[in-house]
Amino acid sequence: MKATRFANRAWAFVLAVLMTLTLIAPQALAANTVDPVEPASGKILVSQTDYTLIDGVTESNIFLNTKEGNAQIAGFMTTIAPGAKATFKASYNGYYTEGSTPASRKDKAANLAWSMEKTTLQAANYTKATGGNVIMAMNGDYYNMQTLQPLGYLIMEGNLIQKNNGVANEPYFAVLKDGTYAIRDAGVDCSDVLEAISGPFYLIKDGQPCYSGNPDLMPRNCIGIKADGTVVTFLADGRQSPYSVGMTIDEEVSFLYAQGVVNAIFLDGGGSATCATKREGTTELQVRNRPSDGVERTVASALLLVSTAESDGVFDHASLSPNNTVYTPNS
């Protein structure tokens, strides 16, 4: 009899929990999603898997291929919607160190030594120095392989490290003091910039694709902005057929243009191309792509996406991770 009463109470508890869950707002249980990506010209979308990093920030792992199915591309896209509680931070090895303060880092900025470190370790150093929650990290600008100096703009916490290395004339991605983002030509006044990192050239400028004609298939990396202020980062793995053959620059341009990006710059690709994320419900930043060297490479600068959300201790939503979350067209 006691066993029967216990079983009845257990079932009553389970039913009560289920009924409570049905009363929770649907959006509290739903993962962020973005629209299915538009493939680059001449490519088809094979699959797309979306992961929420925080509300308004979505990681999309995609596979593209030719219609013949003989040139697969593995891509990693992060979409940061306007109003998302996150911001970008430029990073360079040795700037963010444990125990440093904004004041000490400002003093250090004028004499920062050129050196290299992995993207994920730069993110870890940022967290040690500031306590910030890095939810996405990617490598940044080209650099001089002898001196390790980045070629273009580098601004961190409003501290101008350099506008260029005396030779390059690179455009730059910027976080402005009002919290908005911009991609600007070299030479444009940067007094209103908090964070900046350069890329060697434009992929899209003022809504116009910048095709190069370069036929090389390579790992590619980039960042762009849509007309509504949405920021898109995209990395394509390469040199690893049949897993991922890579992209030409023009294919990368075509892909970004199809997503509605109006301004975009190229970032360092090849073996340096790195994309790491911390998915909602997890505690560690993990490299999601497969660097073509087989391991994560040390790089000069990096770009970190940091959550600015503050916990108030109140339940907001549950993070659900079903086993099958893949979008496959026409399935």
Residue ranges with predicted function:
Residues 2-14:
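Bacterial N-terminal signal peptides that target proteins for export
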Residues 13-23:
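Bacterial N-terminal signal peptides
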Residues 21-35:
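Sec-dependent signal peptide cleavage junction
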Residues 31-165, 182, 325:
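Zymogen propeptides
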Residues 63-67, 72-77, 198-228:
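Conserved beta-alpha junction segments in alpha/beta enzyme cores
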Residues 135-139, 172-174, 181-182, 222-224, ...:
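Structural recognition of the beta-strand scaffold that forms the well-ordered cores
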Residues 147-167, 209-262, 272-324:
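Conserved, well-ordered active-site substructure
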Residues 166-210:
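A substrate-binding/cap region within the structured catalytic cores of diverse enzymes
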